[in-house]
């Protein structure tokens, strides 16, 4: 889990627009962010394996 202080800091409007960055909506993680799901890769994988994200399946070839 991300530090609460850092999540709050990211939610506030930055002095310059360039300083804003994306964070996972579930856990607040700043890295490995997937825009399509608005979550980090770990949360997407966790939900996809449980079948909670419609249309997402594990690849097999």
UniProtKB/Swiss-Prot annotation:
Domain of life the protein comes from: Bacteria
InterPro entries, sorted: Ribosomal_uS14, Ribosomal_uS14_bact, Ribosomal_uS14_CS, Ribosomal_uS14_sf
Required co-factors: Zn(2+)
Cofactor details (free text): Binds 1 zinc ion per subunit.
GO molecular-function terms, A-Z: rRNA binding; structural constituent of ribosome; zinc ion binding
GO biological process: translation
Binding site for Zn(2+): 24, 27, 40, 43
Keyword Ribonucleoprotein carried by entry: yes
GO cellular component terms, semicolon-separated: cytoplasm; small ribosomal subunit
Gene3D superfamilies per UniProt: 30s Ribosomal Protein S14, Chain N
Any Pfam family matching the protein: Ribosomal_S14
Annotated keywords: Metal-binding, Ribonucleoprotein, Ribosomal protein, RNA-binding, rRNA-binding, Zinc
Protein family membership: Belongs to the universal ribosomal protein uS14 family. Zinc-binding uS14 subfamily.
NCBIfam families per record: PRK08061.1
Subunit record text: Part of the 30S ribosomal subunit. Contacts proteins S3 and S10.
PANTHER family: 30S RIBOSOMAL PROTEIN S14 (PTHR19836), SMALL RIBOSOMAL SUBUNIT PROTEIN US14M (PTHR19836:SF19)
Role this protein plays: Binds 16S rRNA, required for the assembly of 30S particles and may also be responsible for determining the conformation of the 16S rRNA at the A site.
Protein name: Small ribosomal subunit protein uS14
Gene source species: Magnetococcus marinus (strain ATCC BAA-1437 / JCM 17883 / MC-1)
Gene of this entry: rpsZ
């Amino acid at each position: 889990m991300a530090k609460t202080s850092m999540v709050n800091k990211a939610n506030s409007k930055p002095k310059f627009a360039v300083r804003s960055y994306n964070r996972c909506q579930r856990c607040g993680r700043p890295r490995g962010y997937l825009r399509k799901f608005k979550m980090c890769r770990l949360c997407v994988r966790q939900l996809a394996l449980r079948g909670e994200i419609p249309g997402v399946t594990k690849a097999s070839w």
